[in-house]
Design a protein with these regions (language model features):
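"…together with the soluble PPM/PP2C metallo-phosphatase catalytic core" -> "…together
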Residues: 19-214
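Short, strongly hydrophobic alpha-helical membrane anchors
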Residues: 3-6, 10-28
Length: 214
């Protein structure tokens, strides 16, 4: 690390990411990260889409046979893109790095299941998801308190109960995605909400980057 960068970190009194040091604005970094993730995902998807495993059809999904032959495992592309951008735009703290690794681990679990000639056993997939959820819960509680703040109220939840709630939330969320035909059933609405929120919160910054080459 250069003396200038080190001095900047010392003056700020807090951890900063590389892009924030270059731009000086967290809002600019957030807007840039959003655009980078979108552009990188679109580019990588167009390049590697044909190399993804093919859907074999789904026996219990509505119109599952119509999915036969479609590309599967696209999470390998967009999760890795998101992970790279995340490491570039968030402070390099151990907590955030662990979350990123767990995100990739969860994605790889689904990808290898998609790529397998024989679908994995439900108990195997559920156990992997459970381990990921437990590690995520322990990581969060190791770096954060068990206090919950709501408006003017604040109260603490016992560690064991808080851990159970985190594990249930993460484990259930992973399996809700599995029950909605992969990410297809959730991505559209989440993308619309996320994009709309970014446009409202960072309209000026996004506009500046979008028109920078004009």
């Amino acid at each position: 690390m250069s003396e200038t960068t080190g001095a900047a970190l010392c003056r700020s009194g807090k951890e900063e990411n590389m892009l924030q040091l270059l731009s000086g604005s967290q809002r600019t970094v957030d807007a840039l990260g959003f655009l980078l993730a979108f552009a990188l995902t679109a580019l990588m998807d167009s390049v590697f889409r044909e190399k993804l495993p093919q859907d074999h059809g789904r026996a219990f999904a509505v119109n599952g046979e119509l999915s036969k032959g479609k590309a599967r495992g696209s999470g390998l592309i967009f999760v890795l893109c998101i992970a790279l951008v995340t490491l570039a735009v968030v402070p390099l703290r151990t907590e955030y790095i662990i979350y990123t690794v767990l995100l990739i681990a969860s994605m790889l679990s689904g990808y290898f299941d998609d790529a397998s000639e024989v679908a994995w056993n439900e108990y195997k997939k559920g156990f992997i998801d459970l381990v990921i959820a437990i590690v995520a819960g322990v990581t969060y509680l190791n770096f954060n308190s068990t206090a919950v703040h709501f408006l003017n109220w604040s109260f603490a939840i016992p560690y064991p109960l808080y851990l159970v709630l985190i594990v249930v939330l993460i484990w259930a969320s992973i399996n809700v995605v599995n029950c909605t035909d992969g990410v297809d059933g959730l991505s559209a609405s989440l993308a619309v909400v996320s994009i709309g929120t970014f446009l409202l919160a960072y309209g000026k910054e996004l506009g500046d980057y979008a028109t920078a080459a004009i």
